[in-house]
Amino acid sequence: MRLVVQRVTDASVSVGGETVGEIGLGLMVLVGVTHEDTSEDAAYLAEKLVNLRIFEDEGEKMNLSLLDVGGSVLSVSQFTLYGDTKKGRRPNFTKAAKPDQALQLYEEWNSMLRAKGVTVETGRFGEMMDVKLTNSGPVTFIMDSKA
């Protein structure tokens, strides 16, 4: 699994002009799944994400986690995170998981975050979405479950 994590002051996702997910302080997370991913990958990244100290304390040091600040997650499925652009001019998406596998792991990952006490808003899997966010910092990380 691959995540693009952005620390935000607010974020929203809409489908066809309708807002389907919206958060205040927290993390906007694009979630990519490859065919080799399992529940263990989802569990590893869920645990890592909620405890990653990327929010600033009173001394302006990145010392607080999502759980520490009571932040939320806006989770958006993003198969293009596994796009390969090495050959030609059109990305190849063969490394991305098939939709049924990706949906199952994406939903499982969201459930794991909720089980840790995090409020999770989502986009709509497989839909064309518009994402708006205010990146705080800016602070952005790429996280992979496999090295």
From Swiss-Prot:
The keyword Cytoplasm applies. Keywords: Cytoplasm, Hydrolase, RNA-binding, tRNA-binding. GO terms for cellular component: cytoplasm. It is an enzyme of class 3 (hydrolase). It comes from the Bacteria. A Gly-cisPro motif from one monomer fits into the active site of the other monomer to allow specific chiral rejection of L-amino acids. Homodimer. An aminoacyl-tRNA editing enzyme that deacylates mischarged D-aminoacyl-tRNAs. Also deacylates mischarged glycyl-tRNA(Ala), protecting cells against glycine mischarging by AlaRS. Acts via tRNA-based rather than protein-based catalysis; rejects L-amino acids rather than detecting D-amino acids in the active site. By recycling D-aminoacyl-tRNA to D-amino acids and free tRNA molecules, this enzyme counteracts the toxicity associated with the formation of D-aminoacyl-tRNA entities in vivo and helps enforce protein L-homochirality. Belongs to the DTD family. This is D-aminoacyl-tRNA deacylase. It comes from Bacillus licheniformis (strain ATCC 14580 / DSM 13 / JCM 2505 / CCUG 7422 / NBRC 12200 / NCIMB 9375 / NCTC 10341 / NRRL NRS-1264 / Gibson 46). The gene is dtd.
